[in-house]
Amino acid sequence: MEYPWDDLTLAFSRTSMFPFFDIAHYLVSVMALKQRPGAVAAAWNNPLASWLSAMLHCFGGGILSCMLLAESPLKFLTNHTNILLASSIWYIVFFCPRDLVSQGYSYQPIQFLAAGMKEVTRTWKIVGGVSDANSYYRNAWIVMIVVGWARGAGGAVVTACEQLLKGDWKPEGDEWLKMSFPCKITLLGSIMFTFQHTRHLAISKHDLMFLYTIFLVTIKVTMMMTKDTAVTLTPFEDTLTRMLFGRRQQQQFSSSEKKTEVKPSSNGSASSASKRGAEPSGGAKRHAKKED
């Protein structure tokens, strides 16, 4: 006997991302590129370089996952339909008369809708990455987690490499050194879908896809509505770090080291001051002897 919940989640898991959800993903990615300083001028001066940057933003996750699976990073170019669709979005965003696309995108309801639809595609990418990794390495759950994460959030890593080549790279923007909230939540999703695939998580695939997508969309829209980017996994990370590595003890140890470093310097300064204070007394004694 099938229940309405199963029908809903199963129908949701069979939803096609083409074309509407893919359009939303390309639109949000290209608009993020356009909002960079100097991106519009660079598009007019060198359209080919701007187009390549846009393709990296749109297909960065697929490129990185292909490289991890020893496939050609140019494999995404074989999907001509998606390339033409992403190129069309790039063209109308940068070269539309009177900048009508950017003006329309400036309305918050449109931004909420596009951002929510983009998060839906993130779930499909994670699931696709986990499935592709399993086809190459059977039940290799570490590989499945890494490839699923790369497919879902690898675009940020690829665009960081692009910024490095252009000379715009900054250490605080590197996803390897400081992972953003979307990358962390994508990694968490990749772990859950991998465990579900290996039957270590007792939940059906379509139910997990539905629940995880609802969670992503809710968090993203809430962050945009409240304009609060402080939604992080810090409490969970702190708890896990204390359990595994004893972070609190490490902080106490480092603070005690700092105190011990300060003490010799203070003693040294005091001794030097005493020496400087002793010099005038010695000079005064010599001066007194000369007077005698």
UniProtKB/Swiss-Prot annotation:
Stretch list, region Disordered: 248-292
UniProt tissue specificity: Widely expressed.
Function: Intracellular monovalent cation channel required for maintenance of rapid intracellular calcium release. Acts as a potassium counter-ion channel that functions in synchronization with calcium release from intracellular stores. Activated by increased cytosolic Ca(2+) levels.
GO MF, any single term: identical protein binding
Designated name of the protein: Trimeric intracellular cation channel type B
Gene Ontology CC: endoplasmic reticulum membrane
Record's keyword terms, sorted: Endoplasmic reticulum, Ion channel, Ion transport, Membrane, Potassium, Potassium channel, Potassium transport, Transmembrane, Transmembrane helix, Transport
Catalytic reaction(s) noted: K(+)(in) = K(+)(out)
Membrane topology qualifier: Multi-pass membrane protein
InterPro entries the UniProt entry points to: TRIC_channel
Low complexity bias (residue ranges): 265-274
Localization (cell): Endoplasmic reticulum membrane
Transmembrane annotation, as ranges: 17-34, 48-69, 83-100, 104-122, 141-158, 179-195, 207-225
Pfam name, any one: TRIC
Name of the gene: Tmem38b
Parts of the chain on the Lumenal side: 1-16, 70-82, 123-140, 196-206
Residues that, per the record, bind a 1,2-diacyl-sn-glycero-3-phospho-(1D-myo-inositol-4,5-bisphosphate): K118, R122
Keyword Transport among UniProt keywords: yes
Quaternary organization: Homotrimer; conformation seems to be controled by binding to diacylglycerol (DAG).
Lineage: Eukaryota, Metazoa, Chordata, Craniata, Vertebrata
GO terms of biological process kind: bone development; bone mineralization; cellular response to caffeine; endoplasmic reticulum organization; establishment of localization in cell; extracellular matrix constituent secretion; lung alveolus development; lung epithelial cell differentiation
